[in-house]
Amino acid sequence: MARRADPTPAVFVFGAGKLGTALARALRARGVATTLRAARKGLPRTIRADVVVLAVRDRDVGPVAERMRDAGVVPVRAVVVHVSGALDAEALAPLRGSCAGVAQMHPMISFASPDVVPGLARGNVHVQGDARAVARARALARRLGMTPRTFPGLDAVAYHAAAGLVANGAAALAAVGAELLARASVPRDVAPRMLGPLLRSVADNVEKLGFPRALTGPVRRGDVAGLEKHLATLLAKLPEAVPLYRAAAEAQLPLARAIGDAPAESFDAIARALGRPARDGG
């Protein structure tokens, strides 16, 4: 039996920053009636929506929820969700009793600019909270082409730190890589256009192959000579990047050992080149 299509809700997004604006644009592109309101304009007199999305800073989620409750602007039939990764649904507790339910709806996607809507298809959304709000949030995620997931007992701070480590860390590493490319005579305006596809290929490998198989490069191959050349070049051209390169290579070693494309002695040699004991144990 075919699965029934999720009904199209009306959505009100409060907060016109990077995430809120991009989310509103993505919803409209998929035929969802969406109202976007900047937080600096304050609350409207009334909200006509089935789903109210708070896309504000973490510290503002609770206070905004309290103001919405006190102003009585949320329809009793509506659900309210926030998009913070570090806060669970309890941040919206002030609104319980004045709406149909509250939930966390955090897209594990990087939103860097209100002018760029990132690819949402195949992305994941963590949803947690009251049953009715969770159901509507999951339906909204599916309409965006994303996969809704719920992890009972999730440590929200650790979850958010993991997302930040990958998303923010990758952007920072790419910036360092772009600087090294510039010092290797690649035009600065070209470097981002080279590194973007490279990062997408890494993302594809991570998604499709998982770990440790997503790893590539000299550490996986056990190529200590290649790694030492990299370190020497970095020391000459961009010495401030050496600690980053060493830390990244150290993180690769357990993956490379698990893959086993080279003898253990090769990985021991890499560990010594990085200034670490030959084995981490085992």
Can you say where each PLM-predicted feature lies in the sequence?
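NAD(P)+-binding Rossmann beta1-loop-alpha1 motif at the extreme N-terminus of oxidoreductases
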Residues: 1-48
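Phosphate-coordination loops involved in phosphoryl transfer and adenosine-cofactor binding
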Residues: 8-10, 77, 122
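Short, well-ordered alpha-helices that flank and scaffold nucleotide-derived cofactor binding pockets
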Residues: 21, 25, 29, 66, ...
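Internal alpha-helical scaffold of NAD(P)-dependent oxidoreductase catalytic cores
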Residues: 23, 95, 101, 117-208
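Rossmann-like NAD(P)(H) cofactor-binding subdomain of soluble oxidoreductases
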Residues: 40-116
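Interdomain hinge/lid region at the active-site interface
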Residues: 204-265
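NAD(P)-dependent dehydrogenase/reductase Rossmann-like domain
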Residues: 256, 264-282
